[in-house]
Amino acid sequence: MTEGRIQSYRKKIYVIRQKLKAKKPKFLRYDSDKFYRLGRQEKWRRPYGRDNKTRLKVRGFPAIVSVGYRLPKKVRGFHPSGLRQVIVHNVNELVKVQNQKDNVIVTISSSVGFKKRLEILNKARELGLKVSNEGVVT
């Protein structure tokens, strides 16, 4: 594929992904709007109560998480820039993705320490790879 076609394909996938994500509801914990301690967590917890209306999928109550809301495989795993996101733990993994640098954006794993993070950042600059969490220092 030529560079122009790759860009248009990437943009098309990104637009499709945004449309699908806009339709998907924000899954909040049941009663998170009534209790501050539940709302601030913004974490989905499955309701198990016997008479819980969300669990029973009653109309007018929040949607429950299910497989049907998942995005298609072709549009899954993309960074907001439209590039495929790859998590890297060390310099060797960085070298493996160097031949895909036009289609990939690198994310340094959160478990990587400061010293190794600096090594990865220097190598990424050397190879001309884009890093999504470049400014994040743990």
From Swiss-Prot:
InterPro entries: Ribosomal_eL32, Ribosomal_eL32_arc, Ribosomal_eL32_CS, Ribosomal_eL32_sf
GO biological-process terms attached to the record: translation
One Gene Ontology term, aspect cellular component: cytosolic large ribosomal subunit
Keywords of this entry: Ribonucleoprotein, Ribosomal protein
Highest taxon above the source species: Archaea
UniProt record similarity statement: Belongs to the eukaryotic ribosomal protein eL32 family.
The protein's name: Large ribosomal subunit protein eL32
